[in-house]
């Protein structure tokens, strides 16, 4: 009886250790970091919902993957940034820009460009997206989508561990502009262009992206 009881206790202890090890391997912690700042920029009323028309382009200009065509500038203007109140606080931003995102249209497989609309009537072009660029025409804007993964900072190695630096490529703030000395309207300039996924067919092109003011 004693041997049976001892054996049972050993088995229970072993099972407990196995369960503890299993639990350690099947759970974890995600720590989120952020900051609320005093700045209060607003999107100018007539810039909240904009339409940008790209000129028609021949499909031969978009016959190979990665071809771009018809770079078209557009502007989104901010106002009422209230720098006086912000400058009196330690929780102030130095720069402002826009955060472009689309859960539906961001195309992870094609450099986070914007997917063209599709239709059962087959009147939309295929193998073509819309790409957003910074105003210099050289820096691509990667639209944030539901599969964007580069917000995870590799230098935060444990729960509650503060970030020691800001990764320059994963804040996804476009049109970043210094706030110092800004008075009145603050225009932020960007470019939209066609982006080929391969041999583009003729048809309509239409896509959309959401944006929100973001600070640094």
UniProtKB/Swiss-Prot annotation:
The keyword Signal applies. One of its GO terms (biological process) is cell adhesion involved in single-species biofilm formation. Disulfide bonds join 41-81. Pfam families: Fimbrial (PF00419). It is found in: Fimbrium. Belongs to the fimbrial protein family. Keywords: Disulfide bond, Fimbrium, Signal. PANTHER family: FIMBRIAL SUBUNIT ELFA, FIMBRIAL SUBUNIT ELFA-RELATED. SUPFAM superfamilies: Bacterial adhesins. Its main location: other. This is Major fimbrial subunit. It comes from the Bacteria. One of its GO terms (cellular component) is pilus. Mediates adherence to oropharyngeal epithelial cells. Helps the airway colonization process. Residues 1-20 form the signal peptide. The gene is hifA.
